[in-house]
């Protein structure tokens, strides 16, 4: 009898262990991203997500989103954040900072409570949409409600949604303060206060708003700050509003290891022609092209379209619904090139971007660092090319000195191994894509690759009506003056047939 009972107990234990190991096999895990990664994300302690002892439902969302192992910033942050301690974390762009604060935030949410339990602040509307989607995706098995609120949208819609339970509120500071001041967003029992891109949120334009928002939170709140750059203003905020924060600094160097940086000296009137040459010579999966003003964004997008390349543009003066559409379509691979202002330098994660071009060279090292960080995401390879005129040479030297890096002159031929992947169709698209859209995107990408690699491997771009997307509401007074700068020199025509050296 005793032997039979022992045998039964033994079998039961084995059955439970079996189910413990089988739950992973039943998950709908995406195809593994086989691209090589740099030490920015591979230099870990060897921890697994299971080592954090988080809820199984949360781990299910993590693995179904394509996560395999925690990155260095996640290894350092998650265990400390789970204890409720304040955190000041600094890590490179594209190394997994968002998941580093989203995972512990989700773990500490009580879905049975109807109160708002976490506030995540970001500086831009696009980043708010992206962060809220990460929260929804990783927490999809937890029964948690996530709401995103930003300026440029109707306030009444937000008021109606806040009548229901909202566990995590993601938004931009101005809109959240508006809702809190009106008593619509109740933050009195919200113990978690997160700031992503904290250096931007603590700039003079945002700091008063941030401090007002903190007054709506309980005194025993947890404050977490994340960014790639921390100016002196962050220290004063830390001393004033944080309690013995745990400081994490993984910035042994400022630039990402996987990004190759070049510059090309060109006259202002030659820039469009040089860009045309780059388009014809580079093997671009997706590219982001940065300009220093709203007017130049629109003018350059128009020029690129006239050259025959598909192009979207985005800047802060566009209607919010237009910005959202451009951002959504570009992330989903509808268009190959995006021209934008510094609106999209913060936190935007588009895995398919392998080339960043600074059509206008930035004025400071911080902006430069965030711009080039749009390629080479999560330890992958990327290419950053800077078009430099005579006036930019001092900024080039200054940025090299501040970042401790050397930007090389562009060679006649760029090695494709530095930024091109063997199978770009396997690059993960946004984790929110429904299967039908993902399949459609992959089929379009495959068709494009077939066309682009025809003609002896010469990489050509798709044409298409309506590719010049998103007419903004920017000021037009100086458009004619800016447009003159883009004109080609006499006797020189634009177009793919014209080739010129880029250095």
From Swiss-Prot:
InterPro entries: DEAD/DEAH_box_helicase_dom, Helicase_ATP-bd, Helicase_C-like, P-loop_NTPase, RNA-helicase_DEAD-box_CS, RNA_helicase_DEAD_Q_motif. It comes from Aspergillus clavatus (strain ATCC 1007 / CBS 513.65 / DSM 816 / NCTC 3887 / NRRL 1 / QM 1276 / 107). It holds the Pfam family DEAD. PROSITE patterns: DEAD_ATP_HELICASE, HELICASE_ATP_BIND_1, HELICASE_CTER, Q_MOTIF. This is ATP-dependent RNA helicase dhh1. It comes from the Eukaryota. A motif (Q motif) lies at residues 47-75. It catalyses: ATP + H2O = ADP + phosphate + H(+). Residues 1-38, 425-503 are annotated as: Disordered. Residues 258-418 form the Helicase C-terminal domain. GO terms for biological process: mRNA processing; mRNA transport; regulation of translation. ATP-dependent RNA helicase involved in mRNA turnover, and more specifically in mRNA decapping. Is involved in G1/S DNA-damage checkpoint recovery, probably through the regulation of the translational status of a subset of mRNAs. May also have a role in translation and mRNA nuclear export. Keywords: ATP-binding, Cytoplasm, Helicase, Hydrolase, mRNA processing, mRNA transport, Nucleotide-binding, RNA-binding, Translation regulation, Transport. CDD domains: DEADc_DDX6, SF2_C_DEAD. It is found in: Cytoplasm, P-body. The keyword Hydrolase applies. Belongs to the DEAD box helicase family. DDX6/DHH1 subfamily. Residues 7-18, 434-445, 480-497 have a biased composition (Polar residues). The Q motif is unique to and characteristic of the DEAD box family of RNA helicases and controls ATP binding and hydrolysis. ATP binds at residues 91-98. Its EC number is 3.6.4.13. SMART domains: DEXDc (SM00487), HELICc (SM00490).
